[in-house]
């Protein structure tokens, strides 16, 4: 399993926790997911890093509003799509 596959799996697992209402557990996992994503995206092109910053801002806004379903959607769809778009 590559680092990319691992972080994508963690994104989906964390999103699932938010959907189940396990927001405390999910929030702890989210920190690790964001750290892993950040590491993978450090060497990405500038436009990808800009999209990452926008997605991260949106996810943190969702967390602040306690909109767990929207946060789960951003993690499972927007973030995963971004990670999959990064050239290996």
Regions found by a protein language model. Name each.
Residues 1-88:
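C-terminal-biased regions
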């Amino acid at each position: 399993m590559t680092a990319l596959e691992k972080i994508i799996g963690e994104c989906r697992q964390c999103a699932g926790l938010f959907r189940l209402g396990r927001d405390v557990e999910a929030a702890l996992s989210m920190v690790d997911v964001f750290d892993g994503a950040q590491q993978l995206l450090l060497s990405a092109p500038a436009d990808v890093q800009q999209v990452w910053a926008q997605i991260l801002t949106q996810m943190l806004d969702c967390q602040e509003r306690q909109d767990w379903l929207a946060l789960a959607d951003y993690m499972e769809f927007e973030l995963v799509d971004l990670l999959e778009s990064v050239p290996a």
